[in-house]
């Protein structure tokens, strides 16, 4: 079929170009906002390790842009669910909130970092404890996502805790 000849190029971490379509991992912005700002078709993908990914396409995209993204992700062995185009999407938004809450509990002395991770991994059957997850996913990315959600919705629940800000700052210092 026509999709088998797509030109795919990894532009950077979290950004893949499929012909004229940008497939961008969520940082909290909508596909529509990105498509308008970048003046090209954008599909935002919300994925972690695992077989399921959710995508949101900009309303200004041609239908073929979304079909290309779905085809590409399916070729990677992913099950693709298309959801509404909202900031933070679904998976990342939820995980970022859990990580932020775990950092808040750590900061307030509720439990040690190891105990929080063990309790959530064994008690809720998460693949990782939220603090180990945060370190793996990147504190800066989680901070950026929560800041985008707070900016968009104006809700206090998305406010990043100060320990997240500290860890993101430390992480940025190690990357320079």
Which residues fall in each region the model found?
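NAD(P)-dependent Rossmann-like dehydrogenase/reductase catalytic/cofactor-binding core
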Residues: 1-89, 93-97, 101-176
């Amino acid at each position: 079929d026509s999709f088998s000849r797509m030109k795919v190029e990894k532009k950077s971490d979290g950004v893949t170009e499929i012909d004229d379509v940008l497939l961008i991992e969520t940082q909290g912005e909508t596909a529509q906002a990105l498509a308008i700002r970048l003046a090209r078709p954008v599909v935002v993908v919300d994925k972690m390790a695992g077989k399921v990914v959710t995508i949101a396409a900009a309303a200004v995209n041609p239908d073929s842009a979304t079909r290309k993204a779905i085809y590409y992700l399916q070729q990677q062995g992913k099950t693709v669910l298309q959801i509404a185009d909202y900031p933070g999407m679904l998976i990342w938004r939820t995980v970022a909130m859990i990580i932020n809450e775990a950092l808040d509990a750590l900061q307030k002395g509720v439990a040690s970092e190891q105990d929080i991770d063990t309790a959530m991994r064994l008690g809720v059957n998460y693949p990782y404890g939220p603090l180990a997850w945060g370190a793996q996913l990147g504190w800066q990315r989680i901070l950026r996502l929560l800041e985008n959600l707070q900016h968009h919705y104006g809700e206090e629940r998305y406010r990043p805790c100060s320990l997240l800000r500290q860890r993101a700052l430390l992480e940025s210092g190690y990357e320079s």
